[in-house]
């Protein structure tokens, strides 16, 4: 158990094995002995690339073995080869202790400095004069080294008298690449690593067809045939159970193999040097060397879209996620607590929301738990901004479909939405623009139920973008008509934000928030609106724009209401929406944003394109506008002042 081993890689690309070490440590001799099955006492100081065909190795995967120079002046060439290596063979000679010392004093520290993260095999060259090293085994000699440098997979001894050992060195180097120990097993503590446990749990649950938490004899046989194309005979299963009852009683019962027993069996495979069997099973279920699902399993064609299209979860995926939530919300209190979330993602490499991007982006309960609305909102956000990651994690939590692409859909182009004068998008992305201290972060806090003075979303001078996501729904239960709103705060750089056309095309609605008590804040917000609307119009990806008058708990600047109303009327958008995050009064802003998105043909600023404006600028100069008078020229005075300033 398991019986039979198939090809665990299937990759035709040759594996690059780079041989490194001090002069006289046997680098070139090792390569020559392995490749030609003969020992040459007189060989060149540096061999050319040695290509070993697939027939050379049991796994029938070719390799290119690269000799390196020991001369200090050739260090740059060695570094280049090491950076491109799939595996490194680090050599020393038993009769030259200084070559062993250099492994820990120079070569291994160098590899760490270069951040080389490939398997390393230490090869000890045994000379004829055995008294030179007093019959110490290579395990005794290298044990301290391997404890200090865990990247060393194994150490192997070879000699000119036993040429098959030279082949073994290269074979182990290749196997360390094809079936690496490092990702799956903690050799210091002799336990499976967390990612390997997660992958094996997923395989166990996928193989447990009746979902009783046990792999029956029939289910074990199906797993065996899937992975190795060879069934188990009844006596083999019986023998496995008998051994398990003696060595690990909790691993088996009268109905079959438990999850703990399954993990125990796979641990034994590694301890018995049968790691290839484990990797064969992992790869049959789509895992790559980093124990994530391979790119070939993620249907990237499902995400092909134009710049003004987005990706959303389908109703099938949403219903699946609801069922998952209800299953792991063990007490049914509509609060998926952190430990319950941990159980949910036990079959994934880690939680998908550990990245800083997802920190503090949705509403959390006092204990850090998530309501169903917040849970679904996070999935919608991940699907919007990183569709492959979303689909990958749906597969980790066992989305029940042979076609993973059925979990997502690409929305209609926004240009077609405008022609139809309606949008059916269920996830709306709203870009939040505004000058510094206008109240952007406070608005995002308000949206996800955080306090007005919570500074977790404050940019603190950062130019990074920040998200907040939540469902905007009518009171009552969640329905298919509820929509998810994503607020994306666009941080302002010192030289202006100047988002690219492609970045702006993803915007469904833009709001421009300003401090209603500060005239400069108002003028800056108008400048931003003009710039954004112009870029959008020139690119052909226009979208509704709204002005938001924040901090209405403060006294407005003189003629604020009259001026803001006149400007918005002249450019064809709604009057500014008054809000006060401090008082918790947002005037139903979030519903108004969704309404604007549902009517993509409205609230489009009437702004001239740069081309038309350039022609007019050649024929007349722009009039200056005095502070407080706000005399508009065709409703675009603030915009033209901004343009004149940019061109001066």
Curated annotation (Swiss-Prot):
Record family assignment: Belongs to the mitochondrial Rho GTPase family.
Tissue: Expressed at very low levels in roots, leaves, stems, flowers and siliques.
UniProt keyword terms in alphabetical order: Calcium, GTP-binding, Hydrolase, Membrane, Metal-binding, Mitochondrion, Mitochondrion outer membrane, Nucleotide-binding, Phosphoprotein, Repeat, Transmembrane, Transmembrane helix
The Miro domain, residue ranges: 12-179, 425-599
Any one GO molecular function term: calcium ion binding
PANTHER family found in the cross-reference section: EF-HAND CALCIUM-BINDING DOMAIN-CONTAINING PROTEIN 7 (PTHR46819:SF1)
Modified residues (Phosphoserine): 11
Organism of provenance: Arabidopsis thaliana (Mouse-ear cress)
Superkingdom: Eukaryota
Sites where the protein binds Ca(2+) 2: 329, 331, 333, 335, 340
Leader sequence residues: none
Function: Mitochondrial GTPase that may be involved in mitochondrion development.
Ranges in the topological domain labelled Mitochondrial intermembrane: 645-648
Location of this chain's protein in the cell: Mitochondrion outer membrane
Cytoplasmic side, ranges: 1-621
Name of the molecule in the record: Mitochondrial Rho GTPase 3
GO biological process entries: mitochondrion organization
Transmembrane segments: 622-644
Residue intervals of the EF-hand domain: 195-230, 316-351
EC number(s) on file: 3.6.5.-
């Amino acid at each position: 158990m398991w019986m039979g081993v198939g090809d665990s890689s299937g990759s035709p690309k040759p594996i690059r094995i780079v041989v490194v070490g001090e002069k006289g440590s046997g680098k070139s001799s090792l390569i020559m002995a392995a490749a030609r099955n003969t020992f040459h006492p007189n060989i060149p100081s540096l061999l050319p690339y040695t290509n070993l065909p697939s027939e050379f190795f049991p796994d029938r995967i070719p390799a290119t073995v690269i000799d390196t120079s020991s001369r200090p002046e050739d260090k740059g060439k060695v570094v280049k080869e090491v950076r491109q290596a799939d595996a490194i063979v680090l050599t020393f000679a038993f009769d030259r202790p200084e070559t062993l010392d250099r492994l820990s004093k120079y070569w291994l520290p160098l590899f760490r400095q270069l951040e080389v993260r490939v398997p390393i095999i230490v090869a000890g060259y045994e000379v004829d004069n055995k008294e030179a090293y007093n019959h110490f085994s290579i395990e005794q000699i290298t044990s301290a080294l391997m404890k200090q440098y865990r990247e060393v997979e194994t150490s192997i001894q070879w000699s000119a008298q036993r040429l098959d050992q030279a082949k073994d060195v290269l074979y182990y180097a290749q196997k360390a690449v094809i079936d690496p120990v490092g990702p799956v097993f903690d050799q210091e503590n002799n336990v499976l690593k967390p990612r390997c446990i997660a992958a094996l749990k997923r395989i166990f649950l996928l193989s447990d067809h009746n979902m009783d938490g046990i792999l029956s004899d029939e289910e074990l046989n199906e797993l065996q045939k899937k992975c190795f194309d060879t069934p188990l005979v009844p006596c083999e299963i019986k023998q496995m159970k008998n051994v398990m009852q003696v060595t690990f009683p909790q691993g088996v019962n009268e109905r079959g193999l438990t999850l703990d027993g399954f993990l125990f069996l796979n641990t034994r495979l590694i301890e018995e040097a049968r790691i290839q069997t484990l990797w064969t099973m992992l790869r049959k279920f789509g895992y790559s060397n980093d124990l994530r699902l391979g790119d070939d399993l993620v249907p990237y064609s499902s995400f092909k879209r134009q710049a003004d299209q987005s990706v959303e979860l389908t109703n099938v995926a949403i219903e699946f996620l609801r069922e998952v939530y209800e299953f792991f919300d063990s007490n049914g209190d509509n609060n998926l607590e952190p430990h319950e979330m941990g159980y949910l993602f036990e079959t994934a490499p880690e939680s998908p929301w550990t990245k800083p991007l997802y920190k503090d982006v949705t509403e959390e309960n006092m204990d850090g738990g998530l309501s169903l609305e917040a849970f679904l909102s996070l999935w919608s956000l991940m699907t919007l901004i990183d569709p492959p990651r979303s689909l990958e994690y749906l597969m980790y939590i066992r989305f029940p479909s042979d076609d993973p692409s059925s979990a997502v859909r690409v929305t209609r182009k926004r240009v077609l939405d405008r022609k139809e004068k309606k949008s059916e998008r269920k996830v709306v992305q709203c870009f939040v623009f505004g000058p510094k201290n206008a109240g952007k972060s406070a608005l995002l806090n308000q949206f996800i139920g955080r306090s007005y003075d919570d500074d977790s979303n404050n940019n603190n001078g950062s130019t990074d973008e920040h998200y907040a996501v939540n469902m905007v729904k009518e009171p009552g239960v969640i329905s298919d008509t509820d929509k998810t709103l994503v607020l994306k705060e666009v941080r302002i750089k010192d030289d202006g934000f100047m988002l690219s056309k492609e970045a702006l095309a993803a915007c469904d609605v833009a709001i421009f928030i300003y401090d209603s008590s500060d005239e400069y804040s108002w003028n800056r917000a108008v400048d931003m609106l003009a710039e954004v609307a112009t870029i959008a119009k020139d690119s052909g990806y226009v979208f509704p724009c709204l002005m938001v008058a924040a901090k209405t708990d403060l006294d407005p600047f003189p003629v604020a209401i009259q001026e803001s109303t006149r400007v918005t009327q002249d450019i064809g958008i709604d009057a500014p929406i008054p809000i006060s995050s401090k008082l918790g009064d947002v005037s139903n802003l979030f519903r108004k944003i969704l309404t604007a998105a549902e009517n993509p043909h409205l609230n489009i600023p009437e702004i001239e394109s740069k081309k038309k404006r350039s022609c007019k600028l050649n024929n007349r100069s722009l009039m200056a506008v005095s502070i407080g008078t706000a005399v508009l020229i065709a409703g675009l005075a603030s915009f033209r002042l901004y343009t004149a300033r940019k061109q001066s």
